[in-house]
Swiss-Prot record:
Keywords: Oxidoreductase. This is Uncharacterized oxidoreductase MT2133. It comes from the Bacteria. Its EC number is 1.-.-.-. The keyword Transcription does not apply. PROSITE patterns: ADH_SHORT. InterPro entries: NAD(P)-bd_dom_sf (IPR036291), Sc_DH/Rdtase_CS (IPR020904), SDR_fam (IPR002347). It holds the Pfam family adh_short. Substrate binds at S142. It is an enzyme of class 1 (oxidoreductase). The active site is at Y155. GO terms for molecular function: oxidoreductase activity. NADP(+) binds at residues 11-34. The lineage of its organism: Bacteria, Bacillati, Actinomycetota, Actinomycetes, Mycobacteriales.
Length: 249
């Protein structure tokens, strides 16, 4: 076990833009763990966290789609670094909606990464944190899951499922000492959406990370990014279906 005395912050999806930006905002005085595929290629990300004031930075191999490895990974992190202080689930894929409409395997792959893998990892993390009696979980949902649109219904349905699961898990964790924060960003301008036309109220990974870090510090349960999306989606959920199905992305 580490002898730094700092409860580790673990970023699952340590190569993601939002995960990296959030990690930098949480790094000062913390023991950081970046978990991602090809963990031996995370030197630049690790260096950025050291520059941001991390006490120590570790990397771990992590394949979100390898569900059988989730439990052993969480157990080994706790054994090596002590109870996890904050776990951020920053992995996910957008996929190709057009392809997913005719390629069932691709549709399932999107849902597997964006929903099934998240459920698996959250379940293992929540159990470990319950045992410790403390900890924080950060889940990245999306406004795409608040009311699923025809233009991205595969990705949107996965996010809808994740949002529902995380909301229920947050309620189940009430009173245990474990908190769960759901971040609901709008369209994020970054690598995942490169080449796409930004939607109204688009945000950057930096803005998403800043808002999420602030919400985490303030003990919020849900954060909409930007905040104006919340009243917008209250209205959008009331639109008749024949109007909604004509909505662009």
């Amino acid at each position: 076990m580490d002898d730094t005395g700092a409860a580790p912050v673990v970023i699952f999806g340590g190569r993601s833009q939002i995960g990296g930006e959030l990690a930098r905002r949480l790094a000062a005085g913390a023991t950081m763990v970046l978990a991602a595929r090809n963990a031996d290629q995370l030197a630049d990300q690790a260096a950025a966290l050291r520059a941001a004031g991390a006490i120590a930075v570790h990397t771990r191999e992590f394949d979100a789609d390898d569900l059988a490895a989730h439990g052993p990974l969480v157990a080994s992190l706790v054994a090596e670094h002590g109870p996890i202080g904050t776990a951020v689930l920053a992995f996910g894929i957008l996929g190709d909606q057009a392809r997913a409409e005719t390629d069932a395997a691709h549709a399932v792959a999107i849902v597997h990464t964006d929903y099934v893998a998240q459920v698996s990892l959250l379940t293992h993390l929540a159990a470990a944190m319950r045992t410790a009696g403390r900890g924080s979980l950060v889940v990245f949902s999306s406004v795409a899951g608040i009311r699923v649109r025809r233009a991205n219904y595969v990705y949107g349905s996965a996010k809808a499922g994740l949002d529902g699961f995380a909301s229920g898990l947050a309620d189940a964790l009430h009173g245990t000492g474990v908190r769960l924060l759901i971040a609901r960003p709008g369209f994020v301008i970054g690598r995942m959406t490169e080449g796409m036309t930004p939607a109204p109220l688009s945000v950057t990974p930096e803005r998403v990370a800043a808002a999420t870090a602030c919400a985490l510090v303030n003990g919020k349960r849900v954060v909409w990014i930007p905040w104006a999306l919340r009243p917008m989606f209250v209205a959008l959920r009331l639109l008749p279906r024949f109007v909604w199905r004509r909505m662009p992305r």
